[in-house]
Amino acid sequence: GVKNDTSERQNYTVSLFQVDVPKEKGKETEIKDGEVMYSPKQLTLGSGERAGFKFYYTGPHDNKERYYRVKFTETPLQAKVITRKGQRIQSDVVVSLEAILIVRPWTRHFDYAFSNGVVSNIGNTYFKYVSSVGCSTQYNNSKYIPPGQRLEIDNAGQAARRMIIYGNKIIPLTTCP
């Protein structure tokens, strides 16, 4: 959901594009009519109010994972007026936040390969890779690996705790002595 944490009424809109990979540089394409719907189109919230947008996937029920870039934009309803040295200036501050919406495959197939310091996702849905620095119990490195992608581990020759997390499964890749 969104929360208006300003002192003024704000308008919130949402826009949605399909992306080929769930990353910042993912190539955007228009969504086929009716594949993903959301409600409402926009919200107007007073100071301190919160509300949510709902997303509905009505596209194909197949074995392909899909990614959508969701952009939430906050726009003030009135421009701020600043008077300085006898001049009136109006300004707007528009804030946007982006997130990735993931639609998992209808039938999920989890599979991976780990060899020579490379973790590969050979299934059809994403999983999370986590690792520690050395043999610490603090897992300070984490990456989501989408289907067909691979991750080359920078310090593969060094001892570390490395694992894959998928659903409620934890799969150790390397352990510490």
For every predicted segment, state its role.
Residues 1-6, 42, 106-113, 142-144:
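Beta-sheet-dominated interaction scaffolds and their linkers
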Residues 10, 51, 66-68, 97, ...:
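Envelope-exposed proteins and targeting segments
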Residues 17-19, 50, 56-60, 73-75, ...:
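Solvent-exposed coil/turn segments that connect beta secondary-structure elements
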Residues 27-61, 135-161:
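Intrinsically disordered, low-complexity Pro/Gly/Ser/Thr-rich segments with frequent PxxP/GP/PP motifs
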